[in-house]
């Protein structure tokens, strides 16, 4: 647990102490509860695991299914509105911003959520959907929608905004 608290503190210049990070940041609280819920899920205590996940979502605004596999030192920055699905796998040293969805596109009881490599950054509001793989060290820009595999070291961005008119009529 100390490892992911240190990851937050080293990432966020506004964090003044590990105590502040643990008690006042929603990401570490969601991840702490997820570790417990994931263990319960792995020993087939599904209801209790889902109950813990629901409590976490209520407290933090971050929804992580207890079946999701999360690597070391994940940083969920701000976090409100993040959704991480049941069969999602996230590697080590990743950063996820608020409003991100790691979601499925099918309802079959198979692998239906993304696999995220190590050292991946996923920007605000990005949607990564389906049983795809995001390669190590990739960066996904804000509000991007990704539905195909990305090789390692990829950078993907959503279409940029452009001014259509300078006056409102």
Show where each model-derived region lies.
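Catalytic-pocket segment enriched in acidic/His residues
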Residues: 109
């Amino acid at each position: 647990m100390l490892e992911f608290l240190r990851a937050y503190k080293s990432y966020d210049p506004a964090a003044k102490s590990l105590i502040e990070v643990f008690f006042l940041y929603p990401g570490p609280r969601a991840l702490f509860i997820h570790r417990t819920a994931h263990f319960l899920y792995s020993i087939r205590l599904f209801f209790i695991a889902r109950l813990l996940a629901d409590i976490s979502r209520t407290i933090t605004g971050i929804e992580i299914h207890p079946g999701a596999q999360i690597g070391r030192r994940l940083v969920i920055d701000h976090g409100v509105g993040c959704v991480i699905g049941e069969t999602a796998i996230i590697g080590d040293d990743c950063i996820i911003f608020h409003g991100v969805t790691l979601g499925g596109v099918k309802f079959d009881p198979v692998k239906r959520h993304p696999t995220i490599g190590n050292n991946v950054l996923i920007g605000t509001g990005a949607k990564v959907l389906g049983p795809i793989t995001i390669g190590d060290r990739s960066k996904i820009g804000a509000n991007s929608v990704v539905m195909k595999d990305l090789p390692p070291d990829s950078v993907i961005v959503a279409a940029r905004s452009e001014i259509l008119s300078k006056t409102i009529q």
